[in-house]
Amino acid sequence: MSVFEAWYMDEESGEDQRLPHKLSPNQPVSVQQLEHIGVFHWKLNADIYENDPELQKIREEKGYSFMDIITIHPDKLPDYQNKLKMFYEEHLHLDDEIRYILEGSSYFDVRDEGDRWIRIAVSKGDLITLPAGIYHRFTVDESNYTKAMRLFVGEPVWKAYNRPADDFDIRKEYVNSLGSS
């Protein structure tokens, strides 16, 4: 998974969440379609993340003032199985979710404006932002390994609100933004 790729998911498959779940035939989703729903992506050099001027520029432009690093692997993340279940529960946040993949690979699933799942494959060097108010979930792929930088504007907030959360103002603002783009 070296190329940023997204596709509509086979939602009927009850298979392992870590599998690609592509439809047959595959239905790719373009970068423009992702941007329409507020999902943005950059490809950076993860080998120099500690001193990367491009990352620093993005952080300054977007106001990403706080960061930490999480390693998602059975040997590195306490309570791994329960954390994976929690990450894969459909939810939204009151703030943007910003993740920079430093090692490994994984999937972010997001809902489009028609409520269909789009699976986004991310791997080393991918920086992705999901807008506040979008329903989404996360899972590792079959590698069972991702090391990611989590970026935040101001103090970090890790509160997830599981679906249904349609009454939240941030959800209403997000849905309204889709009609105006």
From Swiss-Prot:
Binding locations of Fe(2+): 91, 93, 97, 136
Coiled coil start-end: none
SUPFAM superfamilies: RmlC-like cupins
Annotated metabolic or biological route of this protein: Amino-acid biosynthesis; L-methionine biosynthesis via salvage pathway; L-methionine from S-methyl-5-thio-alpha-D-ribose 1-phosphate: step 5/6
Co-factor note (free text): Binds either 1 Fe or Ni cation per monomer. Iron-binding promotes an acireductone dioxygenase reaction producing 2-keto-4-methylthiobutyrate, while nickel-binding promotes an acireductone dioxygenase reaction producing 3-(methylsulfanyl)propanoate.
Example of a GO biological process term: L-methionine salvage from methylthioadenosine
Keywords: Amino-acid biosynthesis, Cell membrane, Cytoplasm, Dioxygenase, Iron, Membrane, Metal-binding, Methionine biosynthesis, Nickel, Nucleus, Oxidoreductase
Cellular location(s): Cytoplasm; Nucleus; Cell membrane
Reactions mediated catalytically: 1,2-dihydroxy-5-(methylsulfanyl)pent-1-en-3-one + O2 = 4-methylsulfanyl-2-oxobutanoate + formate + 2 H(+); 1,2-dihydroxy-5-(methylsulfanyl)pent-1-en-3-one + O2 = 3-(methylsulfanyl)propanoate + CO + formate + 2 H(+)
One MF annotation (Gene Ontology) recorded for this entry: acireductone dioxygenase [iron(II)-requiring] activity
Topology class, membrane: Peripheral membrane protein
Top EC class, one word: oxidoreductase
EC number(s) per entry: 1.13.11.54, 1.13.11.53
Essential cofactor(s): Fe(2+); Ni(2+)
Subunit structure: Monomer. Interacts with MMP14.
Family: Belongs to the acireductone dioxygenase (ARD) family.
Name the UniProt record assigns to this protein: Acireductone dioxygenase
Originating organism: Danio rerio (Zebrafish)
Lineage of the species this protein comes from: Eukaryota, Metazoa, Chordata, Craniata, Vertebrata
